[in-house]
């Protein structure tokens, strides 16, 4: 190895010991690929090609996040058509469970196969699932479609960030991630608005059909556009023949998937279909814990070839970025579910109008996501945005916990806006931190870990929020409306209880609903405080340092 290549190896590989282990365990074709990677110069995308790439992956992230929340306002119509009230929980959990089970494995796909074609393959599976949901003629068919769409979504966020890593240098990524996440999270928070509009003025099936024409547009944007990879990749046929069985850790996947499914099923069943102390829920939790223990032992045995490598779990920035992402996504899911409940239950707004009432939050989040991304690219440091966003989130959710049936429009709009600014500032911080800290083969795997943490954060804290909401509501109704029938009100649902409550009891029931929503926002305050703590772990590093090093190397080469 030449003298001028040695510093480059040290800068680009934070785990040289792992590189040595890879060299020992690899076959000749792997060694050739490693040599190519050492000399590989990335091809950054510019101009109209960059616009097409960013537009394509932004639309995909938007659809993925939209699909998580759009079904919430369509569920009443779906259950009426299919007479399937008992399947309500599965319309959301089938998507989440299948996505979480596959997410860690997606890092391996993006490591060894073309990012563009892997991304389009996962997106294609997502589109097939959407089509099945749209044409479903039974509740079971709809659940199967949601599960297929979840499998497709498992590789979409990781793929979007992997493509971005190969398309633009690290200094420009904060701006691009700000745009992608700013627009993408419009789908998560605006899903109830879109779903309410389709359900009210057309049919719930368009909640899924809409993915198809947008998918065709994504195909036009990406299919014929050259998207460079972060590193040279072997031909797919050679990878499938010589790499998949040795490197993809399918045993780890076979252990991780059922462990995840059992945990998420326990969270789904607990307090809904079964009590938390039931044999079913306890059995699922115990089975999940035991399987996760076996999975951890297997991953330790596999070393650097593990689906979730130990050196990444021990990496402080990856670890804290994943935890931060979990807290962000958990509090975002709670916000997207319980603000509409406040507007529809307490303020008697329609599904469509309640979605419109979320606009202060949505627009402020979009503006701050773009502004923070641009300023991070200019100034270099992303940690301040994480701390600043966490503070705004804590303040905003603290104010949201004071909502009542008589809260004025300027007040709740201001509270929403504060949370929107906070979420916009912090959302992209974990992604930037990981892409800035992790290099080479580990980028896709680290991003898969982060997206998996996101999914678990959403599922776990949404379940905790549901427990808090249900228990508080059951306590507060007798307190504020002593003569009301608690079981009848709860069974009627968040929008149907008005038909079963007398005019005398209605103010008390509305106050009970408002207090129950407030109690869930206390959980969001706690998650925001956790964001503040974990944000300090993402590292005080600058995305501009890599560019400065590259410029110094170019000057050395020119002088030589």
Swiss-Prot record:
Q: Which Gene3D superfamilies match?
A: MFS general substrate transporter like domains
**Where are the compositionally biased (Polar residues) regions?**
24-37
Q: Which residues are glycosylated?
A: 35, 500
Main localization of the protein described in the UniProt heading: membrane
| Phenotype caused by lack of the gene | Does not affect the production of oxopyrrolidines A and B.
Origin, by domain of life? Eukaryota
UniProt keywords (A-Z) are: Glycoprotein, Membrane, Transmembrane, Transmembrane helix, Transport
Annotated GO MF terms = transmembrane transporter activity
Q: Where is this region: Disordered?
A: 1-38
| InterPro entries xref list | MFS (IPR011701), MFS_dom (IPR020846), MFS_trans_sf (IPR036259)
Q: How does it sit in the membrane?
A: Multi-pass membrane protein
Q: What does this protein do?
A: MFS-type transporter; part of the gene cluster that mediates the biosynthesis of oxopyrrolidines, polyketide-amino acid hybrid compounds with feature structures of tetramic acid.
The protein's name is MFS-type transporter opdM
According to its UniProt entry, this protein's organism is Penicillium oxalicum (strain 114-2 / CGMCC 5302)
């Amino acid at each position: 190895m030449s003298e001028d290549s040695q510093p480059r190896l040290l800068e680009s590989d934070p785990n040289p010991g792992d590189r040595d282990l890879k060299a020992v365990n690899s076959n000749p074709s792997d060694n050739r690929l490693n040599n190519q990677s050492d000399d590989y110069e990335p091809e950054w995308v510019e101009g109209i090609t960059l616009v097409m790439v960013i537009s394509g992956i932004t639309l995909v992230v938007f659809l993925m996040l939209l699909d998580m929340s759009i079904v919430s306002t369509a569920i009443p119509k779906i259950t009426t058509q299919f007479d399937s009230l008992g399947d309500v929980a599965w319309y959301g959990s089938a998507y989440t469970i299948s996505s979480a089970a596959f997410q860690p494995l997606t890092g391996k796909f993006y490591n060894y196969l073309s990012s563009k074609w892997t991304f389009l393959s996962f997106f294609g599976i997502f589109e097939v699932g959407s089509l099945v949901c749209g044409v479903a003629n039974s509740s079971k068919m709809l659940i199967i479609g949601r599960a297929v769409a979840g499998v497709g979504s498992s590789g979409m966020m990781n793929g979007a960030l992997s493509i971005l890593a190969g398309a633009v240098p690290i200094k420009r990524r904060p701006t691009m991630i700000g745009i992608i996440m700013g627009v993408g999270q419009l789908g998560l928070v605006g899903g109830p608005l879109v779903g309410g509009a389709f359900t009210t003025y057309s049919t719930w099936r368009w909640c899924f059909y809409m993915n198809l024409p947008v998918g065709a547009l994504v195909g036009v944007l990406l299919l014929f556009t050259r998207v460079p990879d972060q590193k040279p990749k072997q031909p797919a046929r050679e990878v499938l023949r010589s790499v998949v069985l040795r490197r993809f850790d399918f045993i780890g996947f076979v252990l991780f998937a059922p462990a995840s499914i059992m945990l998420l099923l326990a969270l789904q069943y607990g307090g809904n279909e079964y009590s938390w102390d039931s044999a079913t829920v306890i059995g699922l939790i115990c089975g999940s814990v035991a399987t996760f223990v076996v999975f951890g032992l297997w991953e330790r045995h596999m070393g650097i070839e593990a689906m979730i490598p130990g050196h990444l779990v021990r990496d402080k920035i990856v670890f804290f970025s994943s935890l931060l992402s979990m807290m962000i996504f958990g509090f975002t899911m709670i916000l997207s579910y319980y603000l509409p409940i406040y507007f529809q239950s307490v303020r008697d707004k329609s599904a469509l109008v309640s979605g419109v009432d979320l606009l202060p939050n949505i627009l402020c989040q979009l503006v701050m996501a773009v502004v923070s991304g641009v300023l991070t690219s200019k100034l270099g440091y992303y940690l301040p945005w994480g701390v600043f966003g966490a503070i705004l989130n804590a303040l905003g959710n603290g104010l949201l916990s004071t909502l009542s049936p008589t809260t004025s429009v300027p007040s709740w709009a201001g509270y929403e806006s504060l949370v929107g600014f906070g979420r916009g500032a912090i959302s992209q911080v974990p992604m930037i931190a990981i892409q800035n800290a992790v290099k080479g083969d580990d980028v896709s795997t680290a991003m898969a870990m982060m997206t998996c943490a996101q999914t678990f954060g959403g599922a776990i804290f949404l379940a905790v929020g549901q427990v808090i909401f249900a228990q508080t509501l059951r306590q507060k109704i007798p307190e504020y409306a002593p003569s009301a029938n608690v079981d009848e009100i709860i069974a009627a649902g968040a929008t149907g209880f008005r038909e079963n409550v007398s005019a005398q009891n209605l103010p008390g029931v509305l106050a009970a609903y408002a207090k129950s929503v407030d109690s869930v926002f206390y959980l969001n305050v706690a998650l925001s405080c956790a964001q503040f703590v974990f944000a300090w772990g993402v590292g005080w590093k600058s995305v501009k340092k890599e560019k400065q090093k590259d410029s110094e190397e170019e000057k050395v080469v020119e002088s030589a």
